[in-house]
Design a protein with these regions (language model features):
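Short helix/turn-capping signatures at newly exposed starts of structured segments
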Residues: 1-136
Length: 136
């Protein structure tokens, strides 16, 4: 399983175009396997249930072989291979303001504050970024 280190520049690119570490919506299953190898956890598509490729803290959801949404979380230390390198909520909010990106607070759950920018969601624990998703 790959260990993903996400820095400020990676997050800024993600906020601008939804791409992070070469992963984006619309990619096909073979591109995902070429990028991350075979998943540790896998659930095939069944009727209306999406196919899930799980790589520790990275979950990729596909429908008819194409990425429909994905999430990255550093919440679970035992399974997480995701490291958000000290990216603060203030840093993200300043970036959004400077680039006229609309961001709104959604809710708080288990001490995590969730924000949304278009179809991108961000989660902060004690003002540190710990969760991102797109398409969900």
């Amino acid at each position: 399983m790959q260990y993903l280190i996400l820095r400020e520049d990676d997050i800024y690119l993600f906020l601008n175009n939804g791409v992070i570490k070469e992963l984006s919506l619309g990619m096909d299953k073979h591109q995902i396997i070429n990028l991350f190898e075979r998943p540790n956890n896998y659930e095939p598509q069944r009727k209306f249930k999406k196919e899930i490729m799980g790589y520790g803290g990275l979950n990729i959801y596909l429908l008819d072989g194409l990425v429909k949404y994905f999430s990255m979380s550093a919440l679970n230390n035992e399974t997480s291979n995701i490291n958000f390198e000290g990216i603060s909520k203030d840093c993200i909010l300043r970036y959004a303001d400077a680039h006229n990106l609309s961001i709104k607070k959604l809710f708080e759950f288990d001490d995590v504050e969730y924000f949304q920018m278009d179809n991108i969601k961000l989660g902060f624990l004690e003002d540190a970024l710990i969760y991102i998703s797109v398409g969900m």
